[in-house]
Amino acid sequence: MNSIYEKLTTCLASVREKTDFVPETAIVLGSGLGDYAEQIKIETTIDYKDIKGFPTSTVPGHKGRFVFGYVDSVPVVIMQGRVHYYEGYPITDVVLPTRLMGMMGAKKLILTNAAGGLNTDFNPGDFMLISDHIATAIPSPLIGANIDELGERFPDMSEVYSRRMREIVKEKADKLGIKLREGVYVQLTGPQYETPAEVRMCKILGGDAVGMSTACEALAARHMGLEVCGISCITNLAAGLSDKKLNHKEVQETADRVAKQFTELITAVV
């Protein structure tokens, strides 16, 4: 058995020792957005540290647990905190939680993140619906022997982010009166914030927002056949686009400011 898949089955067995909950939708909460998990009807929670072989997040604002429950009548599993490539994990560990949620039964994945705005029309506090991504700065989670149990060797990526789900998000945002941007997300490695020169490069490539997560998870999810939706909370303007120095505290403060709108939007979309 492929060692990566073996690790996944070990993690799944560990989860199943604690709950037999089968989610329909999986949700990953980004920096500063983790409180959404407290708003649902919670059935049970599992700390990452209690799952054998599971990587744990070291980032402030990431609690590090799965929350199982219901948004209205929809069964969901929520990642309250994610692991990042910059924490030193191999990329296969970074996407292990995504794959695990798919193996739990999830058919849809909603990815959220805190991101820097590259598009000068964007403002801190805006939400950006991800239409596509650029992930060439990070290794693909599909490198290595293909895990046939998960998906095919050469998966199509012409529509990573579901057009159907994007239309739903737009419709719900419009009904809620939430201003929604749309654009291309660029994933860089971090943990350092981008230099002004890197920001210029990302803009030339066609990026509208930049961050340190999400794209690799979307790739792994699409490989498994999950329907993917991505939403960025623009928490700051990228380096060189304003006079402010970038810091994680600002990211969390901006996310806190728009938390109510975020909760309304995600609940409506689910």
Please report, for each region that a protein language model flagged, where it lies by residue.
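Metabolite-binding pocket within alpha/beta catalytic cores that recognizes anionic/polar moieties
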Residues: 1-157
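Generic non-transmembrane alpha-helical segments
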Residues: 14, 18, 164, 168-178, ...
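Non-catalytic positions within long, well-ordered alpha-helices that form the structural scaffold/packing
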Residues: 102-105, 203, 222
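Short acidic/polar active-site loop segments enriched in Thr and Asp
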Residues: 107-108, 208, 227
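Active-site/ligand-binding-proximal alpha/beta "capping" segment
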Residues: 172-208, 266
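Zn-dependent metallopeptidase/amidohydrolase metal-coordination segment
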Residues: 212-250
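His/Asp/Glu-rich mid-to-C-terminal helical/loop segments that flank catalytic regions of hydrolases
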Residues: 239-270
